[in-house]
Amino acid sequence: MYSLSISTSGKYISVAIHDDKLISTSSVLSENGTTNLLMKSIDEITKKSRIEKSDISVVYLDIGPGYYTSLRIGLAVEQGVCGSLGIPLVPVNGLDALAFAAHTGHRKICTIIDIKREEYAFCLYKPVPVSYTHLTLPTKRIV
């Protein structure tokens, strides 16, 4: 079975299909029409990967921080997709996902996300075996 990972938290709609390894990704600039672009991106990536939507067993969704309206649209669309397929929707904190991707096992990590209008969210992490732990709680700052 396959997993679908989605982010609508920023300027781009990003979609990925993976199992034990990454199979396919797509990233599209979202100026307007996030709902249509998200559904189109999911359709295109499943076709490109030759995977039926019914073969997807879980959806991981970036729940922010990020662009408020885009996050709400992503959540609404994916609740519908997961409900129709009868599969779980797993929320993923965007700052934590960035820290996990950058994890080296020996360095502190600071993740920063632009959340619009000169506002940024950030969090500091310290390494622990195989993962990381928060040094600070996620924080929002206006520049």
Language model regions located:
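N-terminal beta-alpha supersecondary unit
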Residues: 1-61
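Stable alpha-helical structural segments in soluble proteins, enriched in small hydrophobic residues
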Residues: 45-49, 84, 102
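Conserved phosphate-binding catalytic cores of ATP/NTP-utilizing and phosphoryl-transfer enzymes
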Residues: 91-110
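Short glycine-aspartate micro-motif
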Residues: 3-5, 60-62, 70, 109-112
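DPxDG-like acidic metal-binding loop motif
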Residues: 58-89
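Conserved small/polar residues in nucleotide/adenosyl-binding loops
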Residues: 133-139
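Short, well-ordered secondary-structure micro-motifs
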Residues: 16, 101-103, 121-124
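Beta-strand/loop-alpha-helix module characteristic of Rossmann-like adenine-cofactor folds
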Residues: 111-132
